[in-house]
């Protein structure tokens, strides 16, 4: 039996340096955001993120790390290099540049000694409103310890910019997209395939985009008994009511970052299961302010705190590979 430590983190605008190659359109969109974003500041930002990741999982770091708000593969490789040097592990990357307006992507980093990924079964689904925005990344993993297969789905849904209700239809579209691919995965691989969904959904577990459109529920029993529609069990309901959250806005915590699992992780004979009680929001004094909210790193153009990390807390869980 082996345990796999899985972490998700919104890295808060991990842009490449100000003078890195970009399309003219992206330069126009990011012009103010990149002012003063030097190689030195980027290196400091990466070091801060890696320092926090070094603290999790008994100082061993994650076995698989899902991230969002990463600009491109170049900056992702810089991040990986620092992570590998700090943890003495070798990670591989799953990433593709998407058409997001701000050029920020979803990616996975995974320990190559523990996992293999089927490159023929890696998919990048773009969520489109009036223009392409955000993405969903799907990858088939195989545990090198047990040879068991599972699917990870990373999400970064459209933001609440312009108002929560006004922007909600875009997240409903994202929820429909996730539900479709959850159905498709199970049609192809069978209901027994373990699926772990993670991401920054920019909505909470009880919002309609999650419950009605992504088909994610507080009831494991509903997931197990579902016949025609494959539901997802949302692990973040465990934190509802605890005044905990992953993102702080307008004097309140929000649970925007979430884990969800398919029926294949809930049945008694599941190939992989989430260790009971292992889901956690990772909070260390070094990544939070005195009042307990995330200490963001920011940008020179709008307030820089080089002792900060991100405006989101990471979340983690343990997968039991029996």
What is the role of each PLM region?
Residues 1-90, 94-99, 104, 290-293, ...:
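N-terminal, active-site-proximal structural segment of metallo-dependent hydrolase catalytic domains
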Residues 9-11, 37, 42-45, 49-77, ...:
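Active-site beta-strand/loop signature of hydrolases that rely on acidic residues for catalysis
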Residues 22, 29, 152-170:
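Active-site His/acidic residue clusters
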Residues 50, 130-141, 175-183:
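A Trp-anchored, charged/polar loop motif used as the substrate-binding/catalytic surface
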Residues 66-149, 155-158:
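Structured beta-strand-rich core segments of catalytic domains in phosphoester-bond hydrolases
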Residues 74-75, 102, 161-163, 204-208, ...:
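Extracytoplasmic/secreted cell-surface and envelope-processing proteins
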Residues 119-121, 162-167, 208-210:
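A short secondary-structure junction signal
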Residues 140, 184-196, 202-322:
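Metal-dependent phosphoester-hydrolase catalytic domains
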């Amino acid at each position: 039996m082996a345990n796999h430590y899985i972490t998700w983190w919104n890295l808060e605008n991990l842009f490449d340096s100000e003078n890195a190659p970009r399309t003219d359109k992206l330069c126009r969109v990011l012009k103010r955001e990149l002012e003063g974003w030097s190689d030195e500041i980027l290196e400091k930002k990466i070091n801060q993120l890696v320092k926090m990741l070094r603290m999790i999982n008994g100082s061993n770091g994650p076995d698989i790390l899902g991230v969002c708000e990463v600009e491109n593969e170049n900056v992702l490789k810089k991040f990986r290099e620092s992570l590998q040097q700090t943890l003495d592990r070798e990670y591989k990357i799953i990433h593709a540049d998407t058409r997001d307006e701000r050029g920020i992507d979803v990616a996975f980093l995974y320990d190559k000694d523990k996992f293999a990924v089927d490159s023929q079964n890696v998919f990048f689904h773009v969520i489109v409103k009036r223009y392409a925005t955000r993405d969903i990344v799907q990858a088939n993993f195989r545990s090198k310890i047990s040879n068991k297969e599972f699917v990870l789905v990373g999400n970064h849904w459209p933001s609440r910019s312009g108002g929560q209700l006004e922007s909600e239809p875009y997240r409903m579209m994202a929820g429909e997209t996730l539900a479709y691919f959850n159905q498709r995965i199970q049609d192809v691989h069978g209901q027994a395939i373990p699926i772990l969904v993670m991401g920054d959904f920019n909505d909470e577990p009880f919002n309609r985009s999650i419950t009605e459109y992504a088909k994610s529920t507080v009831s494991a029993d509903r997931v197990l008994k579902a016949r025609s529609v494959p539901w997802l069990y949302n692990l973040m309901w465990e934190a509802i009511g605890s005044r905990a959250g992953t993102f702080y806005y307008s004097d309140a915590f929000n649970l925007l970052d979430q884990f969800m699992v398919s029926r294949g992780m809930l049945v008694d004979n599941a190939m992989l299961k989430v260790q009971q009680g292992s889901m956690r929001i990772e909070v260390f004094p070094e990544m939070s302010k005195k009042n307990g909210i995330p200490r963001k790193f920011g940008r020179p153009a709008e307030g820089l705190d080089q002792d900060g990390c991100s405006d989101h807390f990471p979340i983690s869980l343990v997968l039991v590979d029996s």
